[in-house]
Amino acid sequence: MASLLYKNTGIDMTLALVGEKIDRNRFTGEKVENSTFFNCDFSGADLSGTEFIGCQFYDRESQKGCNFSRAMLKDAIFKSCDLSMADFRNVSALGIEIRHCRAQGADFRGASFMNMITTRTWFCSAYITNTNLSYANFSKV
């Protein structure tokens, strides 16, 4: 069951989504702050240029993270977020920034952080700093 809740916390609106399938362009290029996404499905979503700041993507009660598999995360920014147990399999993530986050047990198998310049020249870019990656899986990256 999907639910949506907006909480007015003064100037900002706080978004809380539970069990929701995120439409492809819903957050493309947006800035999302202090919001909660529990058991949400971002698979195939275009999150290019999207900034998530202070957001929760891990539901401690169910011990599940969100699904970002096959999402477009080009130049996406995650700052001070909890991405624990998130599924990032086969994402396109050139230029992604993950800073000051928790990403324990996150699955990055098959993630691509590169762009092909020519058939023999590749450019790779990702910034993952001050982030807890305990038990994260980066095989086939």
Role assignments for model-derived ranges:
Residues M1-V141:
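Tandem repeat scaffolds
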